[in-house]
Design a protein with these regions (language model features):
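N-terminal Rossmann-like or analogous alpha/beta NTP/dinucleotide-binding catalytic cores
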Residues: 21-23, 28-196, 259, 286-314, ...
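Glycine- and acidic
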Residues: 82-90, 115-122, 274-282, 346-352, ...
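Core subunits and conserved enzymes of cellular information-processing
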Residues: 291, 295-297, 370-373, 380-647
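Active-site cores that bind ATP or allylic diphosphates and position pyrophosphate for catalysis
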Residues: 123, 129, 166-332, 390, ...
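Acidic, Ala/Val/Gly-enriched low-complexity intrinsically disordered segments
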Residues: 6-8, 24, 559
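Long, charged, mostly alpha-helical binding arms that flank functional sites
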Residues: 309-389
Length: 647
């Protein structure tokens, strides 16, 4: 399907992922091996946690399940299944991480195994304990528990360095003293091989001496790097003597000033997997070209008796590509720092902390991950698939309430002045066991401004002069007139009601009307701040354009980006096909209004979810909602309003 235009693929995917799977949860321990020097690690067969949620989607078909099933059938790992989720603690998790979390913890749970939470804390310039705490909280929020299996790459710094010295003594690594520009010049290209640098043939003794002096802090940042000696002519750039250690005189948030020599990810994560006895190392497709290096490092160490067999295997799956959002850390940081959003937990942000405030649910993310499946090829998922999944989950679980967002006054002229009564409405129309609540009705009501029209358009079945509608869960009313202010705006709608038509009473449905509107008693309604959130961007691919064109092309996909390591520094590929993604911000992505809600909502607490009847799904804000100040955020509308928008 990847050959199809993006717009066609999006329409196909929106129709495809609408099944509703069942749910399971499993838990079982697995063994764990580490060298003697890492004495604080759990011993083999120590009990640990797997997915501990009661709402994990049931297994569906994907290639990773088939691989694990085959390994289990062949006893490749003795029946063990150990996965891991290894985020770098340099930012907040986003929607794409949710897919990986659900996948890794879910596969472990399905097979009675464990999933490790490991922080890849190898770059002290960017990492902080704040991010670690947020990441751990987000994983727990999604419904998963790593038990005793919470680790850090820095747990293994001593062992990693010991292995680095071993690579040097075996003639498999050397200290390179070239500058970053010099390394780049000798690296070669995708079509031309690299050339050996002047320091590639240093003696073992000289390399070992330099490496130990690097560790001792004798050299400045960038003076030397440690590289593996593999093959400068390899067609795979990652195998052209990759850098595995760099000098950085920077305090680490866990190890303090103990180290000024830090390992790089490609060297660290494969060894960490092997130390933790991970069986299936699952990552996204951009690491596919790194797999030969992954295998080379741990295979050499196993051959040297430094790691146990069987070794972990790396498998790649397609990352989440979602329309109408950006997931790049650089772009997300720009949105925050430039004030385009109200922080990392802004409900419009595709971060998990933002999703939580938006009202997206853990069960919704798990269901979304199951619906979109696991693929080996990149494709785009339309935002409507995620939104529809959240609607399905919220529709099944949230109670109903009434809220008037744009109120005008309605007076029932034949209703006794000063009196009121209780009408009753189900908390959930499909779940009678959730009971019902009382809603007070009186002479003066609030209704939505759009539910009255002086001159109605064709097909309008709500309130108009002389027309009848039913007050939801109440009476049938007939419009007898209306008042306007000096500017010609309708201020009050006047009606009469039929006492014989009260909902739920005998004969109430004898007279049928097409219109049905919601309302609130003016005397009893509770004011609330309502934040109407929508998509942050107004186009599917923010910033995308055809090369040389200054306007976005229909269905155009963003230019691919990647990073390589030169002399220990990550270098991003130029995004020369992008224009400014900020030009595509949606100016209507946030609107704050003062509305009225039914009295029952005065008792709502933060993170309570509701369907505001006829409006959509809302949540009491995690941060700002309190008994003195009711604040509700719109999660999603009742129906997809974007599919009909132009462009």
């Amino acid at each position: 399907m990847t050959h199809l235009p993006a717009a066609v693929r999006i329409k196909f995917l929106r129709r495809l992922f609408m099944n509703k799977p069942n749910h399971v949860a499993l838990r079982n321990p697995v063994g764990h091996w580490v060298p003697e020097r890492v004495a604080d690690r759990p011993a083999p067969n120590e009990r640990g946690g797997a997915a501990s949620t009661s709402a994990t989607p049931a297994p569906g078909s994907n290639f990773l399940r088939a691989i694990i099933a085959d390994d289990n059938a062949n006893a490749t790992y003795g029946g063990r299944v150990v996965t891991r989720f290894p985020p770098e603690p340099n930012g907040y998790l986003h929607y794409g991480h949710a897919k990986s979390i659900v996948l890794n913890f879910g596969l472990a749970a399905e097979n009675g195994g464990t999933c490790h939470l490991r922080f890849d804390d190898t770059n002290p310039l960017k990492e902080d304990v704040e991010y670690e705490d947020s990441i751990a909280a987000s994983v727990r929020w999604l419904g998963y528990d790593w038990g005793t299996h919470r680790y850090h790459a820095s747990d293994y710094y001593d062992v990693l360095y010991e292995f680095a010295e071993w690579f040097v003594t075996e003639g498999l690594a050397y200290v390179d003293s070239q500058t970053a520009d010099e390394v780049r010049a000798t690296r070669g290209t995708l079509t031309q091989p690299g050339t050996p640098g002047p320091y590639r043939d240093r003696s073992v003794d000289e390399n070992l001496d330099l490496l130990r002096r690097m560790r001792a802090g004798e050299f400045a940042d960038g003076a030397h790097v440690l590289r593996l000696r593999i093959d400068m002519a390899s067609p795979n750039l990652n195998m052209r003597d990759p850098v595995i250690y760099r000098i950085r005189h920077t305090r680490h948030h866990r190890t303090g000033d103990k180290w000024c020599l830090y390992p790089l990810y490609d060297y660290t994560h494969c060894i960490s997997d092997a130390l933790e006895r991970v069986t299936h190392s699952i990552c996204t497709l951009e690491f596919q070209d790194h797999r030969p290096l992954y295998d080379w490092v741990i295979e050499k160490l196993a051959e040297g008796g430094r790691l146990p067999r069987p070794l972990p295997r790396q498998y790649e799956f397609a990352r989440l590509n979602l329309t109408y959002v950006v997931l790049s850390k650089r772009k997300l940081l720009q949105l925050v720092e430039d004030g385009h959003v109200d922080g990392w937990d802004d409900p419009r942000m595709p971060t998990l902390v933002g999703a939580r405030r938006r009202g997206f649910t853990p069960a919704g993310f798990r269901l979304f991950a199951e619906r979109i499946g696991v693929s080996k090829s990149d494709s785009w998922i339309d935002m409507s698939v995620l939104e529809e999944t959240m609607r399905d989950e919220l529709n099944a679980t949230t109670v109903r309430r009434m809220a008037v967002l744009d109120p005008i006054r309605l007076v029932i002229e034949n209703y006794p002045d000063g009196e009121s009564e209780e009408t009753f409405a189900p908390n959930h129309p499909q779940q009678p066991d959730l009971g019902r609540r009382a809603i007070p009705l009186s002479r003066e009501l609030w209704i939505e401004r759009e539910d009255f029209a002086e001159t109605p358009p064709k097909g309008y079945f709500r309130l108009t002069p002389g027309a009848e509608v039913r007050l939801r869960h109440g009476y049938i009313i007939r419009c007898t007139g209306f008042d306007k202010d000096e500017s010609g705006n309708v201020t009050t709608v006047r009606c009469t009601y039929d006492p014989a038509t009260r909902s739920g009473t005998p004969g109430a449905d004898a007279r049928k009307v097409k219109g049905n509107i919601h309302w609130l008693s003016v005397a009893h309604a509770v004011p609330a701040e309502v934040r109407l959130y929508d998509r942050l961007f107004r186009v599917p691919f923010p910033g995308a354009r055809i090369s040389g064109d200054e306007t976005p092309a229909e269905g155009a996909e963003p230019a691919p980006t990647h990073a390589i390591v030169l002399a220990g520094e990550e270098v991003d590929a130029a995004e020369d096909r992008e224009r400014n993604f900020l030009d595509d911000l949606n100016p209507a992505s946030k609107r704050i209004i003062t509305a009225f809600v039914e009295p029952a909502l005065a008792n709502a607490v933060a993170e309570d979810h509701f369907q505001f009847e006829r409006h959509g799904y809302f949540v009491a804000d995690l941060v700002d909602h309190n008994p003195e100040r009711l604040v509700f955020n719109r999660t999603v509308t009742l129906r997809d309003s974007w599919s009909k928008k132009p462009g």
